[in-house]
Amino acid sequence: MQAEAYVELTARYETPLFSYSARMLGGLRDGERCLIAALTAGWTELEGGGAEPARPQEWFTALVRERCFDELARRGAVSAEDDLAGTGDCVALAADAALATLRPAYRDLLLLRDVHGLDPALLCAVTDMSEADAENQLYRARAEFAAAFAALPAPDRCPLRRTDCPDCAERERLRTQPAHALLHLGPLEVRDQVRSALRAALGSGS
């Protein structure tokens, strides 16, 4: 596989991979750096031109996931940084803030299963868990997220006056159904610079 073909392959999966890494690490720029580093390491693992991975989604997700956990082990706890604040409505802002309070293992499972919709088989393959273990951990993760979301104070960065904001009203309603707040976490846009940086790291001039 040539470097440009590898970049094109990563482009099929870059949006969910970036969205995952940014939310795992609590910031867009950290997410970008992690994604580039993980994909560059993947190219090295393929020995700079090996065959395409047999299961690309599983392979890329595992690469980025491992890189995120390595970064978290070095850095410690995360917070939902200001650059995530403009990526969604007031419900999404609150969901991001609640996710940031969770232990990484729980945040990981919620992002993979409830936000990005990995099916149970793929989730188990990526996390190296049995289906029973994954379901048990997801149950605990959802409960912890629910408690964190319900306990959050009213947002202070609403673009409207909170009394006039339908998203804030929805956020208050979801205090009783906090799992639904995760549905507000949409995909995060990948900047063109990310792909350019990956090409540079791989030595591809295209």
Please provide the spans of the model-predicted regions.
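Short amphipathic alpha-helical boundary/capping segments
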Residues: A94-R103, A125
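Hydrophobic topogenic segments
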Residues: P153-S206
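DNA-recognition helix of helix-turn-helix
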Residues: T127-D156
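Σ70-family region 2.3-2.4 aromatic/basic alpha-helix that recognizes the −10 promoter
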Residues: E14, A22, E32-E47, E52-D89, ...
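A short, charge-rich alpha-helical start-of-domain segment used by transcription regulators
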Residues: M1-S19, R29, W43
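A short pre-motif secondary-structure segment
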Residues: L109-L110
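Short amphipathic helical patch at the helix-1/turn junction of helix-turn-helix
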Residues: A11, R113-V115
